[in-house]
Amino acid sequence: MMIPVILSGGSGSRLWPLSRKQFPKQFLALTGEHTLFQQTIERLVFEGMDTPIVVCNKDHKFIVQEQLAALKLETQGILMEPFGRNTAPAVAMAAMKLVNEGRDELMLVLPADHVIDDQKALQRALALATVAAERGEMVLFGVPATKPETGYGYIRSSQDALLPEGVARVAQFVEKPDEKRAAEFVQAGGYFWNSGMFLFRASRFLEELKKHDGDIYDTCVLALERSQEDGDVLSIDEATFACCPDNSIDYAVMEKTQRACVVPMSAGWSDVGCWSSLWEVHEKDDNGNVTKGDVVVQDSRNCMIHGNGKLVSVIGLENIVVVETKDAMMIAHKDKVQGVKQMVKTLDEQGRTETQNHLEVYRPWGSYDSVDMGGRFQVKHITVKPGASLSLQMHHHRAEHWIVVSGTAEVTCDENVFLLTENQSTYIPIASVHRLRNPGKIPLEIIEVQSGSYLGEDDIERFEDVYGRTSTPIERGVSVKTIAQ
């Protein structure tokens, strides 16, 4: 059986402001009813393909579990990284887990946030790649370069009579080129876009990783030994993983190994890595415009207009991207959308929170939506799922007022436990130990008014939490060196 390894740790910053660090693009429904993450797993349900291993950031654990449960999709485990260290360590942890379990199978490594339109073409490429991988080769899926795209890395192929027909040896990896050089690649032929998809046997990858980047290999061995398992979730040891070098599969292994080969894949692939890529994969109107939401377009061509609540009207635009969300708007020329990543970096440096979360934030117990905020107050609309509860917690700098809009709330405030129903309210003083729970069968909705000198989400001390959310040593400011000792 072939085992997919879904890499779901990306931040998707080039699709800001829709994609945020705490809710990145792989968890958004950008090209259909289901999210990119869900689509990735759905397209791998066919004969000969086992259920996948998912590698994700710890902050996305509950999003992954919810999106899997929503479609009744199964996995054989979730590897939870405390923070990203690029793709080489992520794949190494998955490979080591399989080998340790006596399952030295072929691993199909693929990102969670790509689009593939032609399922049959994908399966044909997989069949060809399997022949090479069974012989010990390390296969990369290359998309034939049909235009001078500057947002992708390129692969140059060469013939090798020892490889199966249709499989080529990788002669060269090329960094993202400028437009002139990219055009030369397309004209020359034999160049492919690097899809970021790979196929190899688990033990072969580990053998090559140990040979070419022993620091990653050794650190991952130790991190796996120290990891904690809870059901199907493996939490990678934070202190050890912090010492792991940050490197991609390409740099750590594929550019150094003598076994790298490429299989052509013409399957309607896109990494939807920027707004112009997303425009390309969508259906367009007669003027080449792509619109979503409450949008009115007049005398405009080849635009991407995305509304999310407000009416967005545009007049006389051409090749422009407009994205509106509740708390941010981004306007860019389609030729300049690669600059969105730098814009996000600039906003981060300015301490802007709009890069981290949407106003509506999802939690394992439900969600909250920031309705209004001032210097010493914040108003939230909180929804708690039936049977769910927030952690038993305390805030050092803020008090809270709760008003029930619908449903029934079970409130714990210090030693008191009581019920509130629609239109009833209560007050939670600063430093009171409290909890909100929904004992009913319908969603609980409340309005929460916070007031105090500091209203950040990190002003929280948890005493009990059914979801296992506890402060980590690094979050408490303890150094990695101290932990390692």
From Swiss-Prot:
Residues annotated as signal peptide: none
Keyword Nucleotidyltransferase part of the UniProt annotation: yes
Cofactors named for this entry: Co(2+)
Listed GO biological process terms: alginic acid biosynthetic process; GDP-mannose biosynthetic process
Listed SUPFAM superfamilies: Nucleotide-diphospho-sugar transferases (SSF53448), RmlC-like cupins (SSF51182)
Pathway field: Nucleotide-sugar biosynthesis; GDP-alpha-D-mannose biosynthesis; GDP-alpha-D-mannose from alpha-D-mannose 1-phosphate (GTP route): step 1/1; Nucleotide-sugar biosynthesis; GDP-alpha-D-mannose biosynthesis; alpha-D-mannose 1-phosphate from D-fructose 6-phosphate: step 1/2
Protein name: Alginate biosynthesis protein AlgA
Organism, as annotated: Pseudomonas putida (strain ATCC 47054 / DSM 6125 / CFBP 8728 / NCIMB 11950 / KT2440)
Gene behind this protein: algA
